[in-house]
Amino acid sequence: LIVRGIAPNVKNAKNVLDRRTPEVFDILEEITHDHPGLLNRAPTLHKLGMQAFYPILIEGSAIRIHPCVCAGYNADFDGDQMAVHIPLSEKSKHEAVHLMLPTHNLLKPADGSPITVPNKEMVLGCYFLTTVEGNGQKNEKNLPLFDDVSQAIFSYQRGSLRLREQVRVKVGREELVTTVGKMLFNEILPVELRFMNAPVKAATIKTIITRALAIFSKEDVVVLIDAIKNIGFWGATICGGLSVSVFDCEIIAEKAGIIKEVEGKVAEVDQNYQQGLITLEEKKRLSNEIWIEVTERIADL
């Protein structure tokens, strides 16, 4: 501000900053361009709790981050707080760019499995796109036949074909029974990873990213992750969606009987404690084991 003549001294420069004039934001955008910042979410349990990003200035007070890096932070969007740090020295900037960008942190430090992968709504969208409408059991000979994938996609864009309707299409030398949704998903995949003709689930996406990391550079894998994210959100919002009914949450009939049985076991443990047969620590441990066992038992029903 002083160099550009907007303020004559430091005191006046602080006043200009407080007034948030347009010149302040122009200069801020200029100095933040191509300058990494660090985002940290407590508790920092592993190195993915602090990563570097190139900031984009927006209006509002909320920090917006890529949804695929949330797993590394163990973050969700219910008001989590994050600290912002600005590396100033050349060495710290070099470390941020070459070691701390999400591009360099695609794997989980604990076991080396991919952690920066599309999940939740993105998986829902991919699953919706790659499933078949109805029961999918039609006579294959009666299905429409297309010479290649582009013809089938064009037919869908023209409105003469539904997204999850079964069709026959020639892929290379094979004739596959598939859907336009599956074709659109495969279009974003590199040629080496095609053709996936089964419903895409969370484990499938993780497998795709694992295979991609073995074949391609990190930069190419990041582009693939972004593409899966985009088509997943498109499938979960524009094309389809999910609603939960109260009838989806039916209580298992046997649950009341199981709970009553377990409460009897816990009461027996408490009685043993009252009689001095077991210690307080043993009582807590045995009670916890009983409730964990019943939780797993109900989950398996």
Over which residues does each language-model region extend?
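Charge-rich, low-complexity amphipathic helices
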Residues: M50, P118, M122, E250-I251, ...
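Gly/Pro-rich turn-and-neighbor structural signature
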Residues: D26-P43, E281-L301
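Feature marking long nucleic-acid-engaging regions of large polymerase/nuclease enzymes
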Residues: L1, K47, I56-E281
